Amino acid sequence: MSNSAVSYKPIVNIENIVATVTLEQSLDLYAMERSIPNIEYDPDQFPGLIFRLEQPKVTALIFKSGKMVVTGAKSTEELIKAVKRIIKTLKKYGIKIVGKPKIQIQNIVASANLHVNVNLDKAAFLLENNMYEPEQFPGLIFRMDDPRVVLLIFSSGKMVITGAKREDEVSKAVKRIFDKLAELDCVKPIEEEEELEL
C-alpha cells in the first residue's frame, strides 16, 4: 500500500488553554480573600490569589495589578465563559470592576492521534528543525514555522502540540505535519503494520 493511500483521519483534542486577562485596574487581594469563598491567598508563598472555578473547570491566578492568568479551559469559548464567570463572581462580592477584561491566549496545548505509525528515524533524517534522541525521549520534537508551534511526535502516530495561539492553528499544524510525513514516506497505515505481525 503506498502512502498516497494513507488517509488523513486525526483526532485532535485541546487539553489546556493558558491566557492572560488584563483588567486595567488594581485589585485589593486581601479584600477579595475576606469576601469571596473558596479563594486561596498566601502572599508569603505566592503573590497572586488562587481562584478555582468548577464550571468550567479552570484556575485563575489573580494579581493586585489587575492581571490574571487563567488556565484549564479546553476551548476559546470555555475560556471566555470562565472569565465572564470570574468577573461576575468578583462583582457579586462587591469588587468593583471597571471596563472590559482584555483576554490574550498565550498557549494552547493539544493532543492528536493521526491513526498511522510514524517512522521517526526516517522523519528525523528528512525533516528540518527537529530533534530526535530516542535514548533520551521516545518522541521526535519538531518546530514548525507556520503556524509557530512545537510538536512532539511519537511512532504510534500520537502527538502533543504546544505553542498555538488560536485553536485553528492546532488543526492546521496537525494537517501540515501529516502531509509532510506522508510526502516523505514516513507514515504507514496501522492495519498494514498489524498484518505484518500475523
UniProtKB/Swiss-Prot annotation:
UniProt gene name: tbp
Annotated Sequence repeat ranges: 14-90, 105-181
GO molecular function terms attached to this record: DNA binding; DNA-binding transcription factor activity; general transcription initiation factor activity
InterPro entries xrefs: TBP, TBP_archaea, TBP_CS, TBP_dom_sf
Protein's recorded name: TATA-box-binding protein
High-level lineage: Archaea, Thermoproteota, Thermoprotei, Sulfolobales, Sulfolobaceae
Record-stated family: Belongs to the TBP family.
Described purpose of this protein according to its UniProt entry: General factor that plays a role in the activation of archaeal genes transcribed by RNA polymerase. Binds specifically to the TATA box promoter element which lies close to the position of transcription initiation.
Keyword list, A-Z: DNA-binding, Repeat, Transcription, Transcription regulation
Domain of life of the native organism: Archaea
BP term (GO), one: DNA-templated transcription initiation
A Pfam family assignment: TBP
Entry annotated with the keyword Transmembrane helix: no
